[in-house]
Amino acid sequence: MLSRRGHRLSRFRKNKRRLRERLRQRIFFRDKVVPEAMEKPRVLVLTGAGISAESGIRTFRAADGLWEEHRVEDVATPEGFDRDPELVQAFYNARRRQLQQPEIQPNAAHLALAKLQDALGDRFLLVTQNIDNLHERAGNTNVIHMHGELLKVRCSQSGQVLDWTGDVTPEDKCHCCQFPAPLRPHVVWFGEMPLGMDEIYMALSMADIFIAIGTSGHVYPAAGFVHEAKLHGAHTVELNLEPSQVGNEFAEKYYGPASQVVPEFVEKLLKGL
């Protein structure tokens, strides 16, 4: 008879096998039938605010970052939303409008990652901490937004997610529930669990190459991804404006503007395929 610990271990192994199979049936890291495709590496890319800064999206932690106008507690926590939902909605409405300005466009780094996905197909996964849609506009489709998406809202009661490009007003409600509920930004706030973590950790365990771009290394769990990838044998690469807080964890490092170092590295990688 299995002990309680044995039952837990058995259940964990079954869940892990089930999740691995589900991932293989999804959009990334699925083995191909064609022999040539089997030789291509599985590449997992993590992007942070640094990749979008050159497109005009202001970063959180730079000297001129958004947090200077508002306290984090006021605009990026569930408690802040409960205290003053109109302030929080106004904050994200302004960011949503900025994202849709014609001058905000994907830069060369975004385009290079779309090119890399074109070459690797479902052996490529992009995990982003950014809530903008510049990766999708550049052409990437295998994307997990672990911190949510600015152009979406969700019902504060049921969690149903809706596409949303305009401002959110106090009168806007979700009608999916018996009683219309307020909408909130589809953004992961401080103290909330990032999205897609099961898929991300499984992908980290399967990756041959892990690349971090434009990340500070301050925010967990993303800052720990390089260590997780290394544990499973992945080659690790940092492409950043300057060394991140976890830069010493990476085997290969290139520093400079994302629009310069990312295309250069992608070309180097593609030549080796």
Swiss-Prot record:
Keywords: Cytoplasm, Metal-binding, NAD, Transferase, Zinc
Active site residues according to the UniProt entry: 147
Annotated positions binding Zn(2+): 155, 174
E.C. no: 2.3.1.286
Subcellular location: Cytoplasm
Domain of life of the source: Bacteria
Residues of the Deacetylase sirtuin-type domain: 20-272
UniProt-recorded Gene Ontology molecular function terms: histone deacetylase activity, NAD-dependent; NAD+ binding; NAD-dependent protein de-2-hydroxyisobutyrylase activity; protein-malonyllysine demalonylase activity; protein-succinyllysine desuccinylase activity; zinc ion binding
Primary enzyme class: transferase
Binding site for NAD(+): 48-67, 129-132, 214-216, 240-242, 258
HAMAP family the record matches: Sirtuin_ClassIII
Similarity comment: Belongs to the sirtuin family. Class III subfamily.
Name of the protein described by the UniProt record: NAD-dependent protein deacylase
Species for this entry: Escherichia coli O157:H7
